[in-house]
Curated annotation (Swiss-Prot):
<dbReference type="InterPro" id="IPR036571">
    <property type="entry name" value="MECDP_synthase_sf"/>
</dbReference>
<dbReference type="InterPro" id="IPR020555">
    <property type="entry name" value="MECDP_synthase_CS"/>
</dbReference>
<keyword id="KW-0414">Isoprene biosynthesis</keyword>
<dbReference type="GO" id="GO:0019288">
    <property type="term" value="P:isopentenyl diphosphate biosynthetic process, methylerythritol 4-phosphate pathway"/>
</dbReference>
<comment type="function">
    <text>Involved in the biosynthesis of isopentenyl diphosphate (IPP) and dimethylallyl diphosphate (DMAPP), two major building blocks of isoprenoid compounds. Catalyzes the conversion of 4-diphosphocytidyl-2-C-methyl-D-erythritol 2-phosphate (CDP-ME2P) to 2-C-methyl-D-erythritol 2,4-cyclodiphosphate (ME-CPP) with a corresponding release of cytidine 5-monophosphate (CMP).</text>
</comment>
<comment type="subunit">
    <text>Homotrimer.</text>
</comment>
<feature type="binding site">
    <location>
        <position position="15"/>
    </location>
    <ligand>
        <name>a divalent metal cation</name>
    </ligand>
</feature>
<feature type="binding site">
    <location>
        <position position="13"/>
    </location>
    <ligand>
        <name>a divalent metal cation</name>
    </ligand>
</feature>
<keyword id="KW-0479">Metal-binding</keyword>
<protein>
    <recommendedName>
        <fullName>2-C-methyl-D-erythritol 2,4-cyclodiphosphate synthase</fullName>
        <ecNumber>4.6.1.12</ecNumber>
    </recommendedName>
</protein>
<dbReference type="InterPro" id="IPR003526">
    <property type="entry name" value="MECDP_synthase"/>
</dbReference>
<dbReference type="Pfam" id="PF02542">
    <property type="entry name" value="YgbB"/>
</dbReference>
<dbReference type="GO" id="GO:0046872">
    <property type="term" value="F:metal ion binding"/>
</dbReference>
<dbReference type="GO" id="GO:0008685">
    <property type="term" value="F:2-C-methyl-D-erythritol 2,4-cyclodiphosphate synthase activity"/>
</dbReference>
<feature type="binding site">
    <location>
        <position position="141"/>
    </location>
    <ligand>
        <name>4-CDP-2-C-methyl-D-erythritol 2-phosphate</name>
    </ligand>
</feature>
<dbReference type="GO" id="GO:0016114">
    <property type="term" value="P:terpenoid biosynthetic process"/>
</dbReference>
<feature type="binding site">
    <location>
        <position position="47"/>
    </location>
    <ligand>
        <name>a divalent metal cation</name>
    </ligand>
</feature>
Amino acid sequence: MESDSMFIGFGYDRHPLVEGRRLVLAGVEIDAPLGSLGHSDGDVLSHAIIDALLGAGCLGDIGTWFPETKEYKDANSLDLLKETVKILEERGFSVVNVDATVVASIVKLSPYREKILENLKSALETSRVNVKFKSGNTLGFEGEERGISAYAVCLVEEKKCTKSI
């Protein structure tokens, strides 16, 4: 197979932080006093990456593929990310790389980086994954510990079969 085209996607997500919910990033449960409010598990990192991947493939957004229905209530967003990779693969795309930033000040996230990266590399089927953490420097809803947000950019490659019969 030979590369035909490369496409860039961008994704973003944010959720309020509330009592009684878990804080999950890329399937990793974070020890935090508040959790992310959302229809699924509220995993803003996985959601931002899903939107970036779907954007790169011109396939809509997370709500197009995983609507707020009973089927996806409290869904594991890492599983949704794996499903998104399958959706892309079925259309001839593969993930080249992902770079993401999570903004939150409720808890220090760097101790979770290696497990988050391990989960993402497995789900995305690429070793070219990077995640950064920012505090918000006391500004905005992330800096005031009222919410969490994530940004992601990705590069996907569309493969064309060049084998001759």
